[in-house]
Amino acid sequence: MASTPSSGSYDLAIVTPTEDHSLRSFSLSQGNVQQTFLVSTQDGAFLDQQKASFLQSYSKDQSILGLVFEFLQFLLDEACPPAPLGAFLGAIESQCVRDANIHDLIVSEPEAKNIIRTYYRAHAVAGLNPRPAPSGLFSTVNIEAHRILMAFGGQGSTNLVCVDELADLYSLYQPLLEPLIASVAPALASLSREPSTLQHYLGREIDLYSWLTIPESRPDRAFTATAAVSFPIIGLLDMAHYYVLGKLLDSDSPKRLRSALQGLTGHSQGIIVAAAVAQADTWASFLAQAQWAIRLLFWMGYECHTAAPASPLSSAAIRDSIEHGEGSPSWLLSVRGLRSPALDALITDCNRRLPESEHLSIGLINTERNIVVAGSPRSLRGLCLRLREIEADDGQDQSRVPFRQRKPVVHHTFLPVSAPFHSSHLRAAADRVKERFPDASSPQVGDLLTAVYHTRTGQDMREMFSPSNNLIHSLVEAVACETVDWPATLQVSRSKPPSHIVLLSSSRLSDLVSEIVDGRGVRIIAGTVLAPTDPAVLGGKAELLTTKPSQAPTPWAELFKARLVAGPDGRPILETRLSQLLQAPPIITAGMTPTTVHWDFVAAVMQAGYHVELAGGGYFDAAGMTTAIEKLAAHVPPGRGITCNLIYASPHSIAFQIPLIRSMIQRGIPIDGLTIGAGVPSQDVVNEWIQTLGIKHLSLKPGSIAAIYEVIEIAKKHPTFPIILQWTGGRGGGHHSCEDFHEPLLQTYRDIRRCSNLYLVVGSGFGQADQMHPYITGEWSLSFGRPVMPCDGILIGSRMMVAREAHTSPQAKELILAAAGVADSEWEQSFKKPTGGVLTVQSEMGQPIHKLATRGVRLWHEMDKTIFSLPRDKRVAALNARKAEIIRRLSADFAKPWFGYNAAGDAVDLEDMTYTEVIARLIRLVYVSHQHRWIDPSYRQLVLDFTYRTLERVSNADYATDKLDLSQPEQFVEQVQQLCPAATTRRLHPDDVRFFLTICKQRGRKPVNFIPALDEDFEYWFKKDSLWQSEDVDSIIDQDADRVCILQGPVAVQYSRRADQSAREILDEIHHGLANHFEEGPSQSDRPSLAISEMVSARVTVTESNTHRIIRPTSESLPSVEDWQAFLASQVTGSVRSAIMAEEVLRGSQRQANPLRRVLEPRTGQSIQIPLDGRDLRLVEDAKNRPLVHIKPSGDQEVAVDFYYYDFVETPGNLRFTYKFDSKSLSLVENLDGRDDRVKLFYAHLWLGRADLSYHRLSEVFEGEEITLSSDLHRHLHNALRHTVPDATASATTNTLPLEAAIIAAWKPLMEPLFVAELQGDLLRLVHLSNSIRYTPGAAPLEVNDVVATKSQVRAVTIKETGKTISVEAQIFRSKTLVATVTSEFFIKGSFSDYETTFSHQDEAAIELKVQSAIDEALLRDREWFLLDDPTQSLIDKTLVFRLHTVTRWKDQSTFTSLKTTGSIYTKHWNGTEQKVGTVASEVVECHGNPVIDFLQRKGTVVQEKVPLKHPGLIDNGSRTIRLPLDNALYSSVSKDYNPIHTSSVFARFADLPGTITHGMYTAAVSRAVTECLAADGETGRLRSFSASFVGMVLPGDQLTVRIRHEAMCHGRMVLSVAAYREGTDEKVLQGEAEVEQRTSAYLFTGQGSQAQNMGMQLYDSSAVARSVWDEVDRRLLDQYGWSILNVVRANPKQITIHFRGARGRRIRDNYLAMRTETRMPDGSTRLEPILRDLTAKSESYTFFDSRGLLYATQFAQPAILLMEKAAFEDMKANGLIQEGAAFAGHSLGEYGVLASLVDFLPFEMMMSVVFYRGLVMQFTMERDSNGHTGFSMVAVSPKRVGKYFDEAMLRIVVDLIHRQSGKLLEIVNFNVEAEQYVCAGHVRNIYILSGILDLLSRSATGPQLVASLRSASDPAITDVAKEIAVYLEKAPQLNNPTELKRGRATIPLQGIDVPFHSSHLRSGVSVYRRFLEERIQAENVQVDRLVGKFIPNVMGKPFAIDRSYLEEAAAVTGSSVLRELALAA
């Protein structure tokens, strides 16, 4: 199929034809795929015309093949002439179908049927015959290799749709089927109209053509399902399938098909079709045979249907059957779930109650458990009722019922048939049919040309009957009267069973066949199915017609066959799939508590060479399990892995054990496997374990059939991961199910074996080789009539408990040896009574458990029956009723005796014991006196805990409890008696009874070994922790083993007959016994290798020269890795061959898969060069003919491996490894001498360009060279990114370099510390964890041509369980100024112990601590590390800031060798400034924490610079999806990171990577670029920091989605979370953070006039920070001046009266009186007077009033505005929104807001007082009339609104004219927006005049002329404008109230302002106000650096400065003598 690229559109493309003589091209295309055909020029032109019409309506959503055939169908619909149709069809044949068959092509096509239909119809219309199918199955058939049985279907569930299915087949293959239909249709029509049948069909005669072509003509399905119709139709359907198949194979003759068959048969009526087919040698004879077969089928159907015995049922009975899921009663009942003997017994029982005419009989045996019963509907319904009585209910849980006591799970349904076929009921009907086919006119058995297998016996009918026998009569008997034995029919038991069974049946016959033949090596092909759902299980029609050979599956007996191979010592080893996985014989010692809890026992088994499971169920905390695994790991043989067995039903244990195993594997502990018992985890849980733990295999122990299928589903979800299914059934020792051992295996084996990654291990009841052998061979299943079912391994447990190394006590072993055991058929009796010495009881988890039937266990069994079976609320009463008896039995028989005994030896309750009696009894039970040991350390503490309680309760004196001596427990009671004599006589207090019971159950304490009470917890006391005593009988009373619980299986216990064998001896005995059963096969080392010729003919080419053999994989199809490696191994010798074949490499105690096998995997473009003597091997890069890897022998049995790397370096890098082959573990052992140094030298050559290691120490500073950041670097970085992030181009147009340029600049100093000699580690296992790049605050970004120098230092080297982390910090300097800091973290995987090299330098986050009390101060002063510069100063009410640095050195992972914390202590002042007041100096050794930081974090608060957003969100669209480059070479070159894993596939494979991996730095750079695009508008300079952690592997070409979230703010910078995810899986591969600067901002503060009621109150309600500012000021103003600013803002009252009563009132009055202003006297002198002139020392109150509301009075408006601005600013600051370095400006009063927020030169409360004073001065120094009016106001003026002809110069002239002509104030005081807005202050009358004049100039037609004359006049006073002003002055009213001012065209009065701010009128108050400020402002509090360059004063309009020029200019503008003097001094 020709393909051409396209844009991905799904429109049909028209391709211009290309003329070539008489041929031309004609093309169709879909999406990016095009199909081109060669046709004649004439036909091509016609097809082009048709295509033009076709384009209007074709379906776009389909494949190219579907499109081609849709166009072909279009031609048919358009009645295309045969010539062009044939030409196009021929082109399809040659270009699409080619040498295949059309059925081959349509298997996966959704429109398969349409294609088939069109294909064959087109052939018919074009007059062409389809080419014969080149069947691989039938063409090359060999009777020995391919034994094909063909089977036809019969009656069944498809009866209802048989007509529909025939019609469907006819529509597909109508041209092929027409002869067959034509030959039989008349016969059926005639037969159904005969007089004898007419009455039955009655208008529903079989009109075949109508039924096939007109759906509406078909009778209802209930009628067609009857035998009278379905018999002939189903028979015809089967013959039609055969006819089509034969025609497709050979249109001339059916002989080709028939002769290829071993035989034919049919299910039920299908045998008639088989007999007809078997006689046909030509198509003509086939049609003749079809006619008699159809006639026979018709009469059989009709006669049987009409002869069916009447058996009326009531409607209620019918309804009942339907409601029970049995269907409508009929004459055949399918029964599934019962075997034939059981069903026979039921039938016999039913028949006893039935007349013979209604007897039941078995009609068909479909499978062992699928049987069909024939009889009348009434009788069959009776059988159904009987089945309901004995069967389990749907969904009934019988898991706790022993298997043999369960109700059978039976499914029984009526089949839609109308006669009791295969029964004696049809004898008369059969005779009538025979009469219609007399011998003379009927075929004979001898006419059969091929074997036809009889359905009763499975015999060839030619051997079963005489050749002259009437064939039809035999067939009638078989279908009507004789039982069908389908398994026998299928020949599976013959010596040469079929290799293939081809089914031509519309029914689900394949299910029946599959159940019978699975595992026997038979391929089932459903020849009626176009596309089977699972081709691996069931073939379809295409498989019959394809050229590809059809292979029969390998029988289970062969596929899973065990064999012998030679072990390392030459002795034979039994090998199965399991042993290949585990590298051990297939005998597993199961995880058992307590036996395999002990690491030494597990080690003994592993040292013996066998697999064993460490039982995690015996560990209750991580520490104990860690210790055990570490000890075990130290004792396991090299190359062997540990498997841990965990109890899934114990969530507490799983919660700590799974993370523990994960961490230990990460540390390198060789844990290979995990076994999960007591439950099957969910898919999600298993998926997480497989993905994250690092295990190599997982074993699951299902307890039921349902659980087995759960395991199967898990295996399907992880098809490449080994899952071991351990099946033990119910006969196993210890916990067990109630399941039969064999039955679940029989039911699930087929499905288990369909999962190639599932390993089947069986256990329970095993103990010797002879007994195990049938399970290894699979012969165990033969007795069940099933094929051989081999198991992969055997699980043993019980017998291992008597091994010498087992901790089982000798007394317990003796009891095990004495137990007789039982046969498998008897073990279920253990539920009721001791059986073979074993009894089943219910464990503490409520599960059945097998234990030896000791006295103790027999008591347990009795308690289960009589006590624990009761509801919990009834147990105590039952216990009390038998109290004396139970106590006696406990003390006499049980491992846990009754606790309560007094000194006299009488059994008593706990409350009746004295305190010393309790202590004495405790010691008696928990201390083993004759061995001088405590049973468990927690028991010793139990004694002490109760003794402490005793002393607290009974003694009145204080005793030092640490003086209690338990070293001699026997004398301990005497100590207590001496200390507290009363304890001897005083009985336990009720509280202490409860206390004792509580501490007995304390978590973490071993459960007590006695029964303290017969209470509601009796089951806990009795059952908890019951197994350990079998390993410590010495701790039991009288050392009586018959008291204890000993796990054993009832079947397996019989095989324990000796206690003197070691674990090795037991296992070797079994293993060698098994091996003796097998013929010795070839040894492992002598397995035949694949011949060269075979490989060459497959997928390898070999070229030989005189010296070498060059081997290459073919480019078309690479060989499998296994074949390739086996072939390479066959070409080399000695140690090189061992290096290739070894599956694992041992590196010290660590194991890993052999990397050389990965390196040598077949790859196009690489070849293998081997000398003819096979001594070495080179992997060669073909394109450049240079070696990449060289493997050669080196010394005795050693091999050296050289790796070469050529890119980016002048001389190739060379890295050598050496290995030695270990024959015992079959692994390579790596020589580690100097290995890590060689790796370092290799990378030093690549990264640093040198050939030696660093001479530095880790603590030194590493200096880099001074480099220039060139434009080439800028360009290369841009080029590396532009294809991935096309819109990241902004940086390319500027000289600003992206952030990652800093890493490139610092590359060598960052890398050099990795080569320090003292830094141990394998750099091949180095991964880059993270990068962080941060610009120094205020530093400009790096730019092209910057010259920078770099130095680095190692900040930390730390060791974790899985490796070593190295943190390196590099500082980049520009002009000797720090510009950026780069921090890189690296991680070297491995296990390290060189803690002496570890350290960490940590700059701690600043911590603020508020000293609020004397206690706080005392606590601080008490710290030794807290050193004040002045110890006498008080710290109370001060805020301390700690800025510290910690240096840490480690002893081990949790202990510090030393920890040194130093730094400075500062006090934080009210304005944020800090003053050093002390130091911190702390150094501690051998510690686990930082006492300084821990204390400060508890008492103080960590200063957080970043403020999280309340509602984080996505930036812009939030994400960008990008695709990474396919090659990493460009970025390697740019970044200088020449690590070969980025560019060399060889090194990547060696490192076990899925391919060359993309640089983490590149992924970070891409993510940075996306961040800039989305969050910084592409402005590189705005990105101030970027950090990235590399959390996932990224490959070239990966598609990533980068997501940006705005998470926080920091000093005005956006803090962004940056994450990159792999598209498709959403796996996170990068997590980072960026800080993006805002565009340069300015913060503007408004002035008076902006006030409004409730201003700032919304923020007050929502912000705690703003609220605290408001509240604090409100409190101060209320306290100082008696009024609430919150009230003023919220209510805007018109008046406030302040009362001066009491001490507080007098103080407030004094505050007002102290506020003075300067008043000029008539004589020119000045004096200070109170601002509130009518306030005296005797005033009792004062009232502020303003008719507009006091918020509009200056003295209240100004502080309110300032407070609102300050609160808003502090809220923004607290949220991190204030940008560092931003400009600040305030409009008028707003300047106070700037200074209060930016500089804090006054405490804000004082600033508020200053502004209040300022407002009062302005308000009350103005003269006011009786109404309070000053006569002044302000107005905003917009010259632009006057007209284009009016500007600022004209405004100045007009203002000046009004001022001069009126003699009153009018000035421009604010220049806000040039030409847009100005503010004038002046007398109200003048403002009125200004508004009128400007209105005149804007509205008058002469306005422009008036302004022009004013502009040109030498004296404005004589202009027309001046005259107009004079007119206004005369007419203007005597205004004094600003409220009368109206808005003009160019003017807006400022409402509420009656003070002419910023005007000369107020100048007189400047000196007084200056003095007022000077008294309050201290020079040292003015932080000038915060003002310079940031604050923009009103009077200057440019940033503040303190240089001379700025001061001079300011002095000139203001006329300030003070500024003038400062300028002179500057």
Swiss-Prot record:
GO terms for biological process: fatty acid biosynthetic process. Residues 1512-1625 form the MaoC-like domain. Residues 1130-1604 are annotated as: Dehydratase (DH) domain. Its EC number is 2.3.1.86, 3.1.2.14, 4.2.1.59, 1.3.1.9. Residues 148-526 are annotated as: Acetyltransferase (AT) domain. InterPro entries: Ac_transferase_dom_sf (IPR001227), Acyl_transferase_dom (IPR014043), Acyl_Trfase/lysoPLipase (IPR016035), Aldolase_TIM (IPR013785), FAS1-like_DH_region (IPR039569), Fas1/AflB-like (IPR016452), Fas1/AflB-like_central (IPR013565), FAS_meander (IPR040883). It comes from the Eukaryota. One of its GO terms (cellular component) is fatty acid synthase complex. Keywords: Hydrolase, Lyase, Multifunctional enzyme, NAD, NADP, Oxidoreductase, Transferase. The keyword Zinc does not apply. GO terms for molecular function: (3R)-hydroxyacyl-[acyl-carrier-protein] dehydratase activity; [acyl-carrier-protein] S-acetyltransferase activity; [acyl-carrier-protein] S-malonyltransferase activity; enoyl-[acyl-carrier-protein] reductase (NADH) activity; fatty acid synthase activity; fatty acyl-[ACP] hydrolase activity; fatty-acyl-CoA synthase activity. It catalyses: acetyl-CoA + n malonyl-CoA + 2n NADPH + 4n H(+) = a long-chain-acyl-CoA + n CoA + n CO2 + 2n NADP(+); holo-[ACP] + acetyl-CoA = acetyl-[ACP] + CoA; holo-[ACP] + malonyl-CoA = malonyl-[ACP] + CoA; a (3R)-hydroxyacyl-[ACP] = a (2E)-enoyl-[ACP] + H2O. The keyword Membrane does not apply. The active site is at 268 (for acetyltransferase activity), 1788 (for malonyltransferase activity). SUPFAM superfamilies: FabD/lysophospholipase-like, FMN-linked oxidoreductases, Thioesterase/thiol ester dehydrase-isomerase. Belongs to the fungal fatty acid synthetase subunit beta family. This is Fatty acid synthase subunit beta. It comes from Aspergillus oryzae (strain ATCC 42149 / RIB 40). The gene is oryfasB.
